[in-house]
């Protein structure tokens, strides 16, 4: 929460006074790809930090019907889609979920970010081995 009792990080569907500015790419509707270049789902919404005035998460609608959050720092966006190098498309199904679809707790943020961070080191067997 921040001053006034409002939630700090919310989806754009709640923070209707925020939007993606031109000429930046609005990723809503674009496919989301894992490191294996397979499609995991598509971008449903963006979550904005209203205090910092920046996007924190991408809400991904998976092909299974579930919805997960993807930290912006683990994504690369271009006109063809959102690319994630830390996990495979199949591993999106195991991303920790939020209890609410309109807000995120600090603990949930930690778990979600840790999942993608751990994927950077452990998503593939070859990532777990020494380099030399």
Where are these regions (language model features)?
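Peripheral interaction segments used for macromolecular assembly
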Residues: 1-132
């Amino acid at each position: 929460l921040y001053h006034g009792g409002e939630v700090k990080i919310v989806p754009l569907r709640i923070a209707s006074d925020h939007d993606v500015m031109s000429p930046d790419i609005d990723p809503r509707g674009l496919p989301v790809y894992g490191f294996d270049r397979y499609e995991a789902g598509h971008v449903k919404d963006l979550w904005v930090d209203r205090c910092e005035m920046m996007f924190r998460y991408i809400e991904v609608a998976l092909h299974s019907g579930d919805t997960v959050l993807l930290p912006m720092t683990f994504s690369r966006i271009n006109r063809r889609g959102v690319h994630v190098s830390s996990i495979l498309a199949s591993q999106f199904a195991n991303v920790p979920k939020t209890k609410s679809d309109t807000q995120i707790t600090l603990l949930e943020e930690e778990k979600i970010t840790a999942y993608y961070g751990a994927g950077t080191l452990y998503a593939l067997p070859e990532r777990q081995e020494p380099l030399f």
